[in-house]
Amino acid sequence: MPVPANAIEAVFLTHAHIDHSGMLPKLCKDGFRGQIYATEATCNLCRIMLMDSAHIQESEAQWRTRKAERAGERAVEPVYDTNDAAAALRLLRPCQYNAAVQAAEGIIIRMTDIGHLLGSACIEVWLREDGVTKKLVFSGDVGNVNQPILRD
């Protein structure tokens, strides 16, 4: 990542799919200590998915290490482990849809339902600095054609 993990103050997670959430434990392993903002449903899904992913990482690394050692090569380390996943989970901050949340000094966010997955959100971010407010919007993935979602 081009920015040191310990220089990041907050992460805004649009949904739990592993291509969006899967490297959060690695971010923590690398020094991230900020907050991870997501909807409550996304937080709940991440609690399952990130621990499962960490177990897979550990098992895969053990298997590759056994194979590598037979070939006289170095042990393989997992990208992250269950301790890293647990660290990421402790940083999750559940947000309600349509509620304004102060994420940091001068930063307010609001998550709105975007219909992609249970708990998915479009994230509006208001940045206030020197009396000027700017609005940014992160869409994440949008919609899910012909796949109704039961509201959380």
Residue ranges and their predicted role:
Residues M1-F12, H17-S21, L27-D152:
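His/Asp/Glu-rich metal-coordinating catalytic cores
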